[in-house]
A protein has these predicted regions:
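Short, hydrophobic-biased amphipathic alpha-helical segments
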Residues: 6, 29, 197-201
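N-terminal strand-loop-strand
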Residues: 50, 69-107, 135, 139
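Acidic, metal-coordinating catalytic segment for phosphate/diphosphate chemistry
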Residues: 31-53, 58-86
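Short, solvent-exposed positions on alpha-helices
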Residues: 24-28, 154
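Extended, positively charged loop/linker patches that create polyanion-binding surfaces
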Residues: 109-111
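Long amphipathic alpha-helical segments
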Residues: 1-25, 38
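Unchanged
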Residues: 113-137, 145-205, 210, 214-219
Length: 219
């Protein structure tokens, strides 16, 4: 979706400009550019009707009270990629998946990185909150540029981290984000939530499990 990329680039420029400018007139111009970016986005992607197809979760695009201008102006400081962390949990040759309440499809457990937590802490917490299983992070398997993979178009630029986690206990549990949890083998993959994980990524995680000496992937 090329127009979404234009809006993202405009948002990045205006966010940096507002961060560093000391001139009141320049600030006004950057704010006008934000309004223009929001108008462009709204013309082809109304924020309340395209949340799922743009790969949004939570407050990103799903709240009906938000507008594109609210979303664009919510980000402060120099624009940097967001980080999504996924837990890769194996049991008997199968991987742990959770069924997303947002779209009814399946994903490796995980979510946006929070300030104040390391990637390992985020992976462990997300797995526990979304599936009920207690795990211990053991290895960073991959760091991917989301835009280089077969995900649906998304407004926020994002890096995805896949963290191997060892299963220590717990039991299947649901949450406000989770409809179900289950383990699936490489030849029995469920319908995947494409904004969160792709089939190619999941199959690569199985390769990492089969060959634990593989180095961390990155692109």
């Amino acid at each position: 979706m090329l127009r979404l990329e234009w809006v993202r680039r405009l948002q990045t420029i205006t966010q940096a400009g507002l961060t560093y400018t000391r001139d009141a007139y320049d600030r006004q111009r950057y704010e006008q550019l934000q309004e223009l970016a929001a108008e462009i986005a709204e013309s082809f992607a109304p924020v309340t009707s395209t949340a799922s197809q743009l790969g949004a979760t939570g407050s990103q695009l799903g709240a009906t009270s938000e507008s594109w201008l609210d979303l664009i102006r919510a980000e402060k400081g120099y624009a940097t990629p967001k980080v999504d962390v996924r837990g890769v949990v194996e049991r008997d040759g199968k991987l742990l998946f959770m069924r997303e309440a947002h779209d009814g499809l399946w994903s490796l457990p995980g979510g946006w990185a929070d300030i104040g937590e390391s990637p390992s802490q985020i992976a462990e917490r997300e797995v526990l909150e979304e599936t009920g299983f207690v795990v211990k992070a053991s290895k960073l398997l991959a760091v991917y540029d989301k835009a280089r993979h077969a995900h649906p178009p998304e407004f926020w630029y994002c890096y995805k981290m896949f963290v191997r986690c060892e299963l220590h206990g717990g039991a299947p549990a649901r949450s406000i984000e989770t409809l179900d949890t289950s383990f699936f083998g490489v030849n029995e993959l469920p319908p995947l939530s494409q904004p969160r994980v792709t089939e190619a990524q999941v199959r690569r995680m199985f390769e990492h499990l089969a060959h634990p000496d593989l180095p961390t992937d990155f692109d």
